[in-house]
Amino acid sequence: MTKLVEIEGIGEKYASKLEGADIKNLEALLQKGSTKKGRKELEDASGISGKLLLRWINMADLFRVKGIGEQYSDLLEAAGVDTVPELAQRKPENLHGKMVEVNEAKNLVRATPSLSAVEKWVAEAKELPRVVTY
């Protein structure tokens, strides 16, 4: 079970609000927040905006791809990829180049992932079933 605070932006305050809505980990957040109805229920129960919840749910979805954790999900988001279906549509070479460019400008991670890692992410994203509906 992955802790809520693994997602950028979910600090102790928001984690506490989510736990009050019976969301104890990222897997529960992804499961409950995968539908519009579930996100609305979460918004009502936690008092957290739907937009912010969706951002976190998309990041939790990216965590399903092996090798993408807190740091790389932030870098992917900064490079314009914030969902698994979006990752699946990307050309690995172009995405890798964009990630290097973004990281040089923003210094989000110590080491950018290798091209082979990005290729594996894109391939895995193509195989993963869609979980989040919009």
Segments predicted by a language model, with ranges:
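C-terminal extensions
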Residues: 1-134
